[in-house]
Amino acid sequence: AQSFRNEQGFRKKKEGWLIKVITYQSEAVLRILKSGQVYRAHKSLSFGKQYGALVDILQLNCESPVFGCLKYHRRCTNGKVSSSVKFLLEVPAEKVKLTEYSVWADFLYAQKFTLAEDYSHVAGLCQELDQETLDKMIHSLQKQKRPWQYRIPQAVLEEIRPEWVIK
């Protein structure tokens, strides 16, 4: 079990470590959580292939991931739009996968150059992307490190549970 002792944004409970995650979601998500139900994202129409690839890479059990950032860490974007609601969550550490934000952004772009049915293979001869670079991106997304080892960590969750919401 990983120890996050002396790292800001982590708290130890008898059940294990909790990580503070900030996420912006719609008001519909707020209603779901207030009703005591678990929120799980539906498959994205726009990014279905990319999100499905990330679900596979991180071995998640969901249709589509829920994204957030870690409190007290650098963030590239906050994900806020005018109609969104900010949630502060305390999530059990084993329920949080982390990726490097810039690698995820590069991977999203790279998917334009992969086979339609296989995110892990470059489609034919491509000047914009070679197989070695794609393999390195996938490996980087898979490899889980301590939060402070990421330049800009992105939190990836399978779901949001009502008991995780602290604000």
Report residues per predicted region:
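ADP-ribose/NAD+-binding catalytic cleft of ART/PARP-like enzymes
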Residues: 1-63
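Generic serine detector
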Residues: 3, 26, 35, 44-46, ...
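Arginine residue identity/basic-tract feature
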Residues: 5, 11, 31, 40, ...
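Alpha-helical structural elements
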Residues: 12, 19, 46, 62, ...
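Helix N-cap / beta->alpha transition motif
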Residues: 17-29, 88-94, 161, 167
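ADP-ribosyltransferase catalytic core
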Residues: 50-124
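Active-site and NAD+-binding cores of ADP-ribose-processing enzymes
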Residues: 91-167
